[in-house]
Amino acid sequence: MAIISSSLDESNIPRSRKELRLVDSKIIADEKINKNLNIVRPTSFKEFIGQEQIKSSLKIAIDASKYRKEALEHTLLYGQPGLGKTTLALLISYEMNSKCRVASAPSIERPRDIVGLLLGLKEGEILFIDEIHRLNKLTEELLYSAMEDFRLDLTMGANRGARCRTINLPKFTLIGATTKLASISAPLRDRFGLCHKIEFYSNDELKQIIFNFSNLINLQLDSDACCSLAKISRGTPRIALRLLKRVRDYAQVMKKTNKISIEIIEKALDSQKIDNRGLDNVDRKFLSFLKLNNNNPIGLDSIAAGMGEESSMLEFVVEPYLIQIGFIMRTPRGRKLTSLGKKYISSNNEKY
């Protein structure tokens, strides 16, 4: 089984200093080339921690495809960044014993780019497209017949010399990953036979992921230390591993040790202005802005202007976790603090 990757999509890598948040689930530049992220990737469903229902469903579909000696149905995976969509896609290729070609939608700029990818596929191979909701319309329309009938309908020439040509394709599997399911057009979405939402991970699952990764990078963490780190990882493995690496840096530089205690975790994260709820300065600034308005509902654009941030960043990066832990609520008139949010920001503003 081989994995062939296209050029990396740099558009999802935050550029400015203020965007490089440790608790942001988007991948950051150094993680694109960090070999540790590849070390920790499981190579079978058995090694993959969490998402039990999805694994069970995929295992049945894969075994059925093998039994019939057919390609797996086209599969769509969606959910927040950092939950393992790419890892699951690669695991499917391992389980199917198929070659997987990896591409990012923003790098597929022209129709001929997707044509080249499709023509390069062989029987039973897998094409994985990350951020598939960002495909342009012309490219997306070429996928309709490719997915449904395994053929490409191309128009060659122009004006009176134009002619249609149909190219048959081998039976392949398209796996799409997206953080924005609603942004995928209905015709494309309906052509996926399997569609799964990747859920946030429990603290116990994150604890096991942290423990496994700490062994791989020669760190000694006891159960309590793993549990402490899991609780502030926002249910996201990518954040958990990123925080663990920053704790490792602190322990090795400041304490000259590879043994991680709860005390070291607290001091390391405190140096990064991350508290025991996993919130950083951006989160606290968001909550403080709501409090300053006497808890009257505020529109997202007004909050973004007041904070000097983009409204889309606040909506898709900051808000989901604050809503998940019950600190803010969305109303028809805007955002406002809950009683938990008021209590938190009142007790933490002095410290930070």
Swiss-Prot record:
Sequence segments annotated as region (Large ATPase domain (RuvB-L))? 13-201
Ranges for region Small ATPAse domain (RuvB-S): 202-273
Its domain of life reads Bacteria
Residues annotated as binding DNA are: 330, 335
Q: Name one GO molecular function term.
A: ATP binding
Question: Gene Ontology cellular component?
Answer: cytoplasm; Holliday junction resolvase complex
Please write the reaction equations for the catalytic activity of this protein. Answer: ATP + H2O = ADP + phosphate + H(+)
Keywords from UniProt, A to Z, are:
ATP-binding, Cytoplasm, DNA damage, DNA recombination, DNA repair, DNA-binding, Hydrolase, Nucleotide-binding
Annotated GO biological process: DNA recombination; DNA repair
> Where located?
Cytoplasm
- InterPro entries cross-referenced by the UniProt entry: AAA+_ATPase, AAA_lid_4, DNA_helicase_Holl-junc_RuvB, P-loop_NTPase, RuvB-like_N, RuvB_C, WH-like_DNA-bd_sf, WH_DNA-bd_sf
Annotated region described as Head domain (RuvB-H), given as residue ranges: 276-352
EC number assigned by the record: 3.6.4.-
Ranges that cross the membrane: none
Amino acids binding ATP: 37, 41, 82, 85-87, 148-150, 191, 201, 238
Return the NCBIfam families for the record.
PRK00080.1 (NF000868), ruvB (TIGR00635)
What does the function comment of this entry state?
Answer: The RuvA-RuvB-RuvC complex processes Holliday junction (HJ) DNA during genetic recombination and DNA repair, while the RuvA-RuvB complex plays an important role in the rescue of blocked DNA replication forks via replication fork reversal (RFR). RuvA specifically binds to HJ cruciform DNA, conferring on it an open structure. The RuvB hexamer acts as an ATP-dependent pump, pulling dsDNA into and through the RuvAB complex. RuvB forms 2 homohexamers on either side of HJ DNA bound by 1 or 2 RuvA tetramers; 4 subunits per hexamer contact DNA at a time.
* Family, as annotated: Belongs to the RuvB family.
Q: What is this protein called?
A: Holliday junction branch migration complex subunit RuvB
**Species:** Prochlorococcus marinus (strain MIT 9515)
